[in-house]
Amino acid sequence: MNSIRVAVIVALSAIVSASAPDPTLPGIGSAMQDMIVKNEIAGAVTVVVSKDKVLHLETAGFADVVAKRPMSPDTLFWIASMTKPVTGAAILMLQDEGKLTVGDPVATHLPEFAALKTPSGKAANLTIAQILTHTSGLGEASGPAAAQAKTLADLVPIWLAAPMQYEPGERWKYTQSGINAGARIVEVVSGMTFDVFVQKRIFDPLGMTSTTFYPTDAQRARLATAYAKNKETGALEAVPPRPDFGPRDRPPQGNGGLYSTAADYARFCRMLLNGGTLDGRRYLSAAAMKFLTTPQTAPGLPTGFFQADTYGNRGANYGWGITTSILRTPHDGVAAMLSPGTYGHGGAWGTQAWIDPVKGVAYVLMVQRSNFANSDASEVRRAFQEAAARALEKR
């Protein structure tokens, strides 16, 4: 009888721990529940960290509604473009080692790019900085050939066959091919495939045990189902996972191929928040960090995803670092509670990480919703960030 009572107590304790992870900040959980009630999301995992610890980790709702599988701290998410800062960090690690600089012509490391021409017929002479700040004008890889690519090397001739979109440095346009070209440069310079490089140099030492381009069967079982909101009924409907699962026969795409958990990505954010170090290990130099944390685009060049007709001229309030979006000045809206100099990146399915060096905190939001009108300005992101800011002010 006693053993049964002990087992019941242990089981109940496990349920409580899973439903209300500690520590938590007040108000964030209820803000996410409001989003669930509104059918904006099925569930969420939220994390807030300081330089030295986790301030908040909380789950809400379901990872899979039909199966009634609740969100948990180890739920896996496709983080999409939140992969990009990892690619930027990899490039800057190689710069720290003297193996390249972001000012190098891309053709120095990928000779095929030497033949690339601009729309005016001039030699393109793209730099690594341009391809990683979305100012290169490089064309996108699309169509059957791109879909059948097995490696990043397979994508190079496809990028080069696509017409350039504009003269390098002339404007800012979000471009996936440039970030993947950066990942290919990591492969050529390091002698490792991109997935192996980031695993050995970033994920393993940081303890990011659930971050991968290629989830195992056990990890797939923890994957959150993605949902789209039916525009007519308002109901959330499941959509297929991306990128497609299967054997390791697809490139480790530096633009958006990673899966991760909220806690894992928060480790990466804490490393950046600490100026490139964590737990006594240095990953990036102070000089390298400046490329991630200060705009590398011109002050007057509009960047970002906020459209003038909807949000005012907010694009001018952002600059772009090496693979990071950087808030130049706060404004009303989704970023109102962030400090100048806050940087980070979101993902196509609503995930987001912001690192606020002024307040000394980082915010990580994990959801899986495929059809936000603008995931970077979504009501869900705003609700999370506002609730977190209010809670931090009261501490």
Residue ranges of predicted features:
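Active-site SXXK
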Residues: 26-32, 46, 52, 76-105, ...
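Short, surface-exposed beta-strand/loop micro-motifs that present aromatic residues
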Residues: 342, 349-362
